[in-house]
Amino acid sequence: MNDYRPLTSEEIEVLKSNDCWAEDWTSVNVAEDFKPNFMHRVMLYGEVNIGAFNKNVEVSQGFVKHAGINNATLRNVTIGDDCLIENVGNYVNNYTIGDDCYISNRSTLETTEGATYGEGNRVSVLNEVGEGNVILFSDLNSQLAAFMVKHFSDKELKEKIRQLIKTDIDNKMPERGQIGNNVKIVNTKEITNCIINDFCEVNGAARLSDCTLLGSAHGNVYIGTGVIAENSIIAEGASVINSVKIQDCYVGEACQLSNGFTASTSVFFANSYMSNGEACAAFCGPFTASHHKSSLLIGGMFSFYNAGSATNFSNHAYKMGPMHWGILERGSKTASGAYLLMPATLGSFSVCFGKLMHHPNTRNLPFAYLIADGDKMFLIPGRNITTVGLYRDIKKWPKRDLRAQENRKSIVNFDWLSPFSVGEILKGKKILESLREVTGDNVSQYLYHEYIIPASSLHKGIKYYDIALRIYMGAVLKRVLKRDPAITPPATQVGTSDWDDLSGLLLPVSEEERIVNDLKEGNIESIQQLIERFEEIDTNYRQYQWAWTYKMICDYYGIPEITLEDANRIHEDYIKARRSWIAEIKKDAEKEFAMGDVEEEVFRNFVNSLNQEVDYEN
């Protein structure tokens, strides 16, 4: 911003001749090289500071106008250099506007008493009628939000986190609304109590109230036609367009909300895509997608998730209120018309078909199909391991990360086989083997928590789980051998026990517990330090993964340590398992091609990509 000086008497006369008026000309200050001839029909109230008008401003591709202020009412406003502000139907009141901005054909831009800009807003996700388990603020990421939700019942920890966030917000809170540099706001009705950072564009929005748009040179924010946003924060690279309505929401980096989607008290992180449908009290972690008008995401925690059309969740038992919730772990899907009765927990990479009752808990049976057939509920464990859909998903997600390197606040680990998911597979394999042992082999079906597992599906589930285990062990060992041919045992015990998925961050539970203790003991003194702890864990992921996997390999093969001879055996098992996996996926693709409506070129290209998998064996 400039150092401003008082107007000269000559400048005042020029302004008056251009039909400008001021409540008090002595309260109007300007930049040193200010040119009054670029202001027309402007009314000035209170303290107003105005920059220079030296450049042209591009208002549309190939169409430029000179910077200036025309047809506007300003009160208590500071304006940077080379802005074009024109046709303000109502007024601009209590705002600071940066350099190189274009503001045109809008009604009101105002900061009122008590403005929060969406910062510090407490929202209740999962439990729709809860007390507010996530605090919205500019530095929020998926890990911190998931951490808050998970530990909300720990009052001491909750209070520590709230105090750190309050301090962070207080240190950054401006005295009035701000518009950054290179911002474009056109054809928009009302903006009240908002911070709009650099390189944002608001085009045709209906109303923005108590919001922060976190644009930057590396990721601009775009707000489009008909959008209403209240008490919300929208992060770098996000777009909210085509009559979307959001209230009490956080929209994370590179998220896209479009086509009349509506959401309240929900959070969306890292490349999530929402169109047409609705969300309420939803925790949408990285790569959550819903495309259909008839889909409702309510009371659920999701990540790497795809909602089929007419997906619905029931969070209300019509007794104590809409307080029930569920978790669909990473990679889950719901088919068209799927319905899930909360509370429920689905293991990683599960797929739901039909109206699923009995509050399923399949965390320890991941990669499952859950199928409702009338009143009967079926569970097909491990089925999703060998599908075309899974193969395409795990290949596409890394390619679809649209975030700039500078704007990756949420940590996203793309490993589909990790100590977290493989830990579930190990438990699932034991569950299936135990069911077979207890019930015997001479039965047509098994029962697991009121879900029917057909006998053939149980046997295949054990087989598919074992394929996944061998693929995982071989892949990790192959990576270790490249940097350490001697296969040195892990230098740490961190990671050898249970793991968790904190909305994209795969981490040992022990490290999460260490963060909890450090927060309570005051060893983490700022939000930035807390975020850095999550980043440190992610940096050490391969080290912790090796500690867990080394122990797992020894347990699986019944060996005290891994020798080079063992490594050769594990690699052979890896190649066999991987080829079996690819063969099963190829069968799945052939079944779909046989339906008759898949173009042969598409099928052949997919099969060719499978055939190339042999290149990654060594």
Could you tell me what each predicted segment is?
Residues 163-180, 185:
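A charged, amphipathic alpha-helical module
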Residues 179, 183, 187-202, 210-221, ...:
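Core alpha-helical transmembrane segments of integral membrane proteins
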Residues 373-618:
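Long, compositionally biased intrinsically disordered regions
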